[in-house]
């Protein structure tokens, strides 16, 4: 599974009411997909576990869109 597909799957699984078809690269995690602060923490933790990486808090705050998360993970893995 590609990084993009895996990130999209994690987001769709963790955010209730979000279909994987809605998880497009340009989508804002908060504004478009409805993630609140707790959901964002859960997303980061799930991505860290799935990709066996550590995501710094400063870097996590910069993940505004789905694509931000995908690109960050591509660089780290």
From Swiss-Prot:
Carrier of the growing fatty acid chain in fatty acid biosynthesis. GO terms for cellular component: cytosol; membrane. It is found in: Cytoplasm. The modification O-(pantetheine 4'-phosphoryl)serine is found at residue 37. The gene is acpP. Pathway: Lipid metabolism; fatty acid biosynthesis. 4'-phosphopantetheine is transferred from CoA to a specific serine of apo-ACP by AcpS. This modification is essential for activity because fatty acids are bound in thioester linkage to the sulfhydryl of the prosthetic group. One of its GO terms (biological process) is lipid A biosynthetic process. This is Acyl carrier protein. GO terms for molecular function: acyl binding; acyl carrier activity. Keywords: Cytoplasm, Fatty acid biosynthesis, Fatty acid metabolism, Lipid biosynthesis, Lipid metabolism, Phosphopantetheine, Phosphoprotein. It comes from the Bacteria. InterPro entries: ACP, ACP-like_sf, PP-bd_ACP, Ppantetheine_attach_site.
């Amino acid at each position: 599974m590609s990084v993009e597909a895996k990130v999209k799957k994690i987001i769709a699984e963790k955010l209730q009411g979000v279909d994987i078809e809605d998880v497009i690269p340009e989508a804002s995690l908060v504004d478009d997909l409805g993630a609140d602060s707790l959901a964002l923490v859960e997303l980061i933790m799930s991505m860290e576990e799935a990709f066996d990486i550590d995501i710094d808090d400063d870097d996590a705050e910069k993940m505004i869109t789905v694509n931000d998360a995908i690109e960050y993970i591509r660089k780290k893995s």
